[in-house]
Amino acid sequence: MTGNEFRFFLSCDISVPVTFRVERLEGNLPLPKSPDLENNAPTDNRTTELFVECALYIDGAPFGLPMRTRLESLGPSYCWNELITLTTKYRDLTAQSQLTFTVWDLSHGEGLIGGATILLFNNKKQLKTGKQKLRLWAGKEADGTFPTSTPGKVPRHERGELERLEKLVNKYERGQIQRVDWLDRLTFKTMERIKERESLKNGSSHMYLVVDFCSFEHRVVFQESGANFLFPSPIASTNDIVVVWDPEVGKINPSEHKQLKLARSLTRGVIDRDLKPSSNERKSIQRILKYPPTRTLSGDERQLLWKFRFSLMSEKRALTKFLRCVEWSDVQEAKQALELMGKWEMIDVCDALELLSPVFESEEVRAYAVSVLERADDEELQCYLLQLVQALRFERSAKSRLSHFLIQCALRNIELASFLRWYVAVELYDPAYAKRFYCTYEILEENMMKIAAGVNGEEDGFKQWQSLVRQTELTAQLCSITREVSNVRGNTQKKIEKLRQLLSGLLSELTYFDEPIRSPLAPGVLITGIVPSESSIFKSALHPLRLTFRAANGGTCKIIFKKGDDIRQDQLVVQMVSLMDRLLKLENLDLHLTPYKVLATGQDEGMLEFIPSRSLAQILSENRSIISYLQKFHPDDHGPFGITATCLETFIKSCAGYSVITYILGIGDRHLDNLLLRNDGGLFHVDFGFILGRDPKPFPPPMKLCKEMVEAMGGAESQYYTRFKSYCCEAYHILRKSSNLILNLFYLMAGSNIPDIASDPEKGILKLQEKFRLDLDDEASIHFFQDLINESVSALFPQMVETIHRWAQYWR
């Protein structure tokens, strides 16, 4: 490249994600004051745990979810050296795009160290590259508005020799300065001495965050996507259409913006009170109210709802849509919206869950949502408890109205207390939110300890809490047992012998507990010990334990304990199966589902309820058909296919229920080993490692309906198969009516660490939304689902995959 050439890339042509590296923190942290020390003398032996929260702002508005580095506690030179990749691509940036960096400390007080903001493009509209040294504003969270109140750029009059040298280093790294090895080594040594001298001169009054922006072969110059600077000159002699670039395309129209502000002004409120929508406007409003919660409203739709806000106050479905129309940065508009919210028709619990999503940041709106949840009974709350705990991530503080509500519910119901404690305890492994969840855990413990003994012989709070703590002690011992049996060389039988040997010898205290323990899976059941002779190990790579516990009421309960497997995804899926079972039964449709209990007790451990059953693969290998197997347990010479009508009906209904549910949730990796059958004919699914459309197998059918299941119904031409299709369509129709509830629950899980959601929350929720086919009316959706069933039955490729899977199981 000659001196007169300037080669560059256009930002609109770069389709790679925005990437940068958070390197280190320079300078001394402000020392916390300790009330235990005289004159608040500083303490040097403190352990500080820092992480950096990074967020992208475009034109002063947040864009995408913030990203966080890992915790770093190897101070005082805090070095993360962590690569951060945003979902936004360079082509999507504007000239006023900014990155905000906020440093948090999880070990002291509120934990805010400081923040800084940096523009991604300089004043020449060139993308900044290389190392950037940002000054942190102590005690301030990074401000992403434009212009920002926390600029990371050091003022010109304070820049020393080091600033000039750092710019030269950036040029050196881009290859713009010739490399001379022996001279470079001397130069860098000299620079280190200058750096030490500058640090001593500046003292410890400032902190700096060093970040390294991605570098390209050439400079990157900003250009809006879609802009075309190269257009042909309009020549009179040509008949071609001339394309002219309009620089104002896509920008805010000042006239329209002014009209919008006037339309929403307070003086319009007097007129708007008496406005009634016309016939066409009413149809448009009804169409908007049917939108799923994931759909973004257009400007015209927002304006329409705002215009008729007073006439919509009697329509409870309209509140969540109306609150999405509010410009919350406008103080007067926000105030008016909150006043209307208080007078609005009370919304349903389903809509209240939507108001707890990250879209709604107003504390008043979130408090209103909690007030609606207070009307729900404990049984309904338990259906949503997992998501309500996840919603704590989106609160502004640890001591929020939602946190207080969950704790109050737990204090009056020991089962809710047990599940709340476990859900919160699992989130303590998330470094970004550990402090918040630990605060909730502490408040729950503190309040439960204060409960006095009941007049009906109920335990006091201390004993109740201790019974929950013993659950953790039990799981710790089960983890130890799992490690012991995994280390045993040999086949599964030798591992089973080792398990029973441990329970009868070294860990014999587990066979009879000193005091009964509440079952983690069913806190209403007290367990008193493990029965060694009835305990076993599954033939699997992780060697899950199958344990039989004695119950205080004289019976037994069987559980599966897994170590080394993240079952939080299974927990979510089974929770949704349980919820859908409840929704179907409310419409008088019992499909004999088996929503067995699942509880994650850690990031890689958990418990599952054991349901006596056999896999279809095992049944078909021993009995050749499902009907032959069921004839052993429910023979009836006068019944259909030689079995009782009740047994066949249970099989047909359960097949229909799980066919619909696994389709909606996009359950993948289905094979005959994770389809189980109870002796009464009830079929159910296990192992949900792939959800929301993910599947390791090529060409998966829309739903898992193998030919053996259809043959058990008498074939595709039988009346029983027709009944099966009828149940499927009825169940699909019922669940479509509750699509908003299901979508809201998944939306609240967007911040969780569940693998198939965390990888791309937005894509996963859109996949779920697609399965409901909300673009179709009821009749069209029934025809769609009937075609879907026919497509799944005719799928041949999955049958080949089943054969391959059986070969793999043989060699395990």
Swiss-Prot record:
Its EC top class is transferase
Which SUPFAM superfamilies does the record cross-reference, listed alphabetically? Answer: ARM repeat, C2 domain (Calcium/lipid-binding domain, CaLB), MHC antigen-recognition domain, Protein kinase-like (PK-like)
Q: List the residue ranges of the region (Activation loop).
A: 685-706
The UniProt annotation puts the region (G-loop) at 537-543
Q: Is Transferase among the key words of this record?
A: yes
InterPro entries reported for this sequence = ARM-type_fold (IPR016024), C2_domain_sf (IPR035892), Kinase-like_dom_sf (IPR011009), MHC_I/II-like_Ag-recog (IPR011162), PI3/4_kinase_cat_dom (IPR000403), PI3/4_kinase_cat_sf (IPR036940), PI3/4_kinase_CS (IPR018936), PI3K-type_C2_dom (IPR002420)
PI3K/PI4K catalytic domain location, by residue?
531-797
Region (Catalytic loop), start-end ranges: 666-674
Extract the GO molecular function terms from the UniProt entry. 1-phosphatidylinositol-3-kinase activity; ATP binding
What's any one GO cellular component for it? Answer: phosphatidylinositol 3-kinase complex, class III, type II
Report the record's Gene Ontology biological process terms: autophagosome assembly; endocytosis; pexophagy; phosphatidylinositol-3-phosphate biosynthetic process; phosphatidylinositol-mediated signaling
Q: What is its EC number?
A: 2.7.1.137
Name the PROSITE patterns for this protein: C2_PI3K, PI3_4_KINASE_1, PI3_4_KINASE_2, PI3_4_KINASE_3, PIK_HELICAL
* Record key words, sorted: ATP-binding, Kinase, Nucleotide-binding, Transferase
Protein's UniProt keywords contain Protein biosynthesis: no
Question: What is its induction behaviour?
Answer: Highly expressed in young root nodules in parallel with membrane proliferation but is repressed in mature nodules.
Question: Which family is annotated?
Answer: Belongs to the PI3/PI4-kinase family.
What is the annotated role of this protein in its UniProt record? Associated with membrane proliferation.
Q: Which PANTHER family match?
A: PHOSPHATIDYLINOSITOL 3-KINASE CATALYTIC SUBUNIT TYPE 3 (PTHR10048:SF7), PHOSPHATIDYLINOSITOL KINASE (PTHR10048)
| Name by which UniProt lists this protein | Phosphatidylinositol 3-kinase, nodule isoform
